[in-house]
């Protein structure tokens, strides 16, 4: 699992999916929020397009560690095209997994399960969870 974890993190760190912000004049129907981890200076700007209680698009820009970048990349893949109710469930179960709390692995895409090792590194919880928690905030204001 450790090698799989490293390989997946490195893959998404070097080639993150859905990375890059949409220009301001093209941001019609997008919600935009920013979050910063004050303990390590990681930060993310998240742009999400919502339509008819669905996540239509996710774009982001990240300054931070490999775990944050990989987490944002996988989140953008796994939650794009989800309805909001399912997205909320996935976010909560992903964060529970990171904290070594009860979660349903069948709700999460297989690649996300490599983040289960974060429970052994509590200092990395915020790195992995920032994009997910920010998206949950965005959903809650819809």
Question: Which residues fall in each region the model found?
Answer:
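Domain-level signature for proteins that mediate thiol-based redox and metal-cofactor handling
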Residues: 1-142
């Amino acid at each position: 699992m450790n090698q799989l974890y490293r390989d997946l993190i490195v893959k998404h760190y070097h080639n993150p999916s859905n990375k890059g912000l949409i220009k301001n004049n093209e941001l019609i129907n997008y919600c935009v929020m920013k979050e910063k981890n004050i303990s390590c200076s990681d930060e993310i700007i998240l742009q999400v397009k919502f339509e008819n209680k669905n996540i239509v698009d996710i774009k982001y820009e990240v300054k931070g560690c490999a775990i944050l970048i990989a987490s944002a990349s996988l989140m953008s893949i796994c939650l794009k095209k989800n309805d909001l109710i399912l997205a909320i469930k996935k976010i909560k179960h992903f964060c529970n997994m990171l904290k070594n709390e009860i979660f349903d692995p069948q709700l999460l895409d297989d690649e996300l399960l490599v983040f289960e090792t974060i429970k052994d590194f509590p200092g990395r919880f915020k790195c992995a969870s920032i994009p997910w928690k920010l998206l949950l905030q965005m959903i809650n204001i819809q």
